[in-house]
């Protein structure tokens, strides 16, 4: 949906990541979704960002991006500081609290590490960030400030934007694909 009707409209190649319970997404190349050999491409949450955790863990997602960068990860990290904050809205309503802001900033560091890896691998013109948590302006502001220091200068041109379609992206994408088959 984002490729045709939203933030990716008119872009030839871009990545779309969704942060929620986990981290998933899509790779768009030449205005087409890249599916991979088993139609499973875009499992960005499975990228290993913490090798020591992966090597010592037993769960397939130990040490992986979504364990540290998903909205679920943020809520879990915040619960160690204030268990009464159980969702993104509550967390960002308390962002002025130094202890909350510190945890949020560590979480954004995790997001940026994964994004920098993906930017270096795919060299997209644009990265679209979706999921309910990504409507918080502070997150995108911080990502814009941090990405240039995390990527090689030849990759710093990448545009990073919020998804525009919210929860309608999947439905609109399915509609578009079905209409192309008719």
List the model feature ranges, each with a label.
Residues 4-12, 49-182:
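ATP-binding/phosphotransfer module of carbohydrate and carboxylate kinases, centering on a glycine-rich
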Residues 11-64:
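Glycine-rich phosphate-binding loop of actin/hexokinase-like ATP-binding domains
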């Amino acid at each position: 949906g984002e490729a045709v009707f939203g933030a990716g409209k008119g872009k030839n190649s871009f990545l779309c990541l969704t942060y929620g319970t986990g981290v998933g997404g899509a790779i768009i190349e030449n205005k087409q979704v890249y599916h991979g050999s088993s139609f499973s491409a875009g499992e960005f949450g499975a990228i290993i960002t913490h090798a020591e955790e992966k090597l010592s863990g037993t769960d397939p997602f130990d040490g992986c991006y979504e364990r540290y960068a998903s909205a679920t990860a943020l809520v879990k990290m915040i619960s160690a500081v204030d268990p009464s904050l159980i969702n993104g809205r509550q967390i960002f309503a308390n962002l002025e609290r130094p202890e909350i802001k510190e945890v949020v900033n560590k979480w954004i560091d995790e997001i940026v590490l994964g994004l920098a890896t993906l930017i270096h691998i795919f060299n997209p013109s644009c990265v679209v960030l979706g999921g309910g948590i990504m409507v918080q302006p502070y997150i995108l502001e911080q990502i814009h400030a941090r990405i240039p220091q995390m990527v090689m200068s030849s990759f710093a041109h990448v545009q990073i934007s919020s998804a525009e379609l919210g929860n309608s992206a999947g439905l609109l994408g399915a509609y578009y694909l079905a209409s192309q088959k008719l």
